[in-house]
Amino acid sequence: MNIFYVIVLLSFFLSKSSGFFPVIEVRIMNRRGNGRSIGIHCRSKDNDLQNQTVTSGHDMSFSFREDFFHTTHFYCDLQWDKETKFGFYSYQAKRDDDGRCSSQCLWKIMDDGLYGFDQEHQIWQIYHLIKKERKEGRT
């Protein structure tokens, strides 16, 4: 009978939906101005949030619970304009678990780059975007 309780407890704690792990919200803000939209497509190994268009001055957000092994990551593609694509990790457990995103990961996209908010130190930091090369014959 005791082994049954151990299995039930383990399955609860290992479940991503359990209340044991805090909810983390990711919010990506388009602050490019002049009415310029950005296409955003975020995904993890378990979730695909599909393509979304975020108009200037607006945000997109999603939330999730960290997995038991702290390996959760969400990668986002940004379609800056018809020719330019960038990518970045909007959440990466190894980078963000130590206070940078304890409950909320804030990202601000501006003309001069991508800024991430560090919750622990209460500062905005600039991040490097990974430029994606356009392949010939593909749109």
Swiss-Prot record:
Keywords: Glycoprotein, Secreted, Self-incompatibility, Signal. One of its GO terms (cellular component) is extracellular region. Pfam families: Self-incomp_S1. The keyword Secreted applies. Coiled coil: none annotated. Its main location: secreted. GO terms for biological process: rejection of self pollen. Glycosylated (S1b) and unglocosylated (S1a) forms coexist. Glycans are attached at N51. InterPro entries: Self-incomp_S1. It comes from the Eukaryota. It is found in: Secreted. Accumulates in the stigma (at protein level). Residues 1-19 form the signal peptide. Belongs to the plant self-incompatibility (S1) protein family. Exhibits specific pollen self-inhibitory activity thus preventing self-fertilization. This is Self-incompatibility protein S1. It comes from Papaver rhoeas (Common poppy).
